[in-house]
């Protein structure tokens, strides 16, 4: 992402983090469930395991080496995923609440399940 010289990079606040289980709610992989492998806050995108798999043809880098075909997960926008409760098997929106110790945690609206420990 090209930015003008002297301007800071913009990091978008995302409702999901690396390691969260999510369900895809839009796109060609709608309905698939997977774990977030990597979050990209600069682009507001996430890489979900087993979702948005594309085939990439790689040229040989050295002489004598043969080219190969690689399949890998590509990023999807964070707005196209919804947090998923593995205990209740339901996708839910997220809200923020405070624990009795005063720590801010994420909570699933449908189930009341606390995500952050």
Swiss-Prot record:
RNA-binding keyword on record: yes
Is Ribonucleoprotein among the key words of this record?
A: yes
Q: What InterPro entries does this protein map onto?
A: KOW, Rib_uL2_dom2, Ribosomal_uL24, Ribosomal_uL24_CS, Ribosomal_uL24_KOW, Translation_prot_SH3-like_sf
* GO molecular-function terms, A-Z: rRNA binding; structural constituent of ribosome
Its name, as the record gives it, is Large ribosomal subunit protein uL24
Q: Would you kindly state one Gene Ontology biological process term found in this protein's UniProt entry?
A: translation
Output the Gene Ontology cellular-component terms. Answer: ribonucleoprotein complex; ribosome
Which keywords are on file for this protein?
Answer: Ribonucleoprotein, Ribosomal protein, RNA-binding, rRNA-binding
Q: How does it assemble?
A: Part of the 50S ribosomal subunit.
CDD domains attached to this UniProt entry: KOW_RPL26
């Amino acid at each position: 992402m090209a930015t003008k010289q002297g301007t800071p990079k913009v990091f978008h606040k995302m409702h999901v983090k690396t390691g969260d289980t999510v369900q895809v709610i839009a796109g060609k992989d709608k309905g698939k469930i997977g774990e977030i492998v990597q979050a990209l806050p600069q682009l507001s995108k996430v890489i979900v395991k087993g979702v948005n798999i594309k085939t990439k043809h790689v040229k040989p880098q050295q002489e004598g080496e043969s080219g190969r075909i690689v399949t890998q997960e590509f990023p999807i926008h964070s707005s196209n995923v919804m947090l998923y409760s593995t205990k209740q098997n339901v996708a839910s929106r997220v809200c923020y609440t405070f624990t009795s110790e005063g720590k801010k945690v994420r909570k699933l609206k449908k189930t009341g399940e606390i995500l952050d420990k």
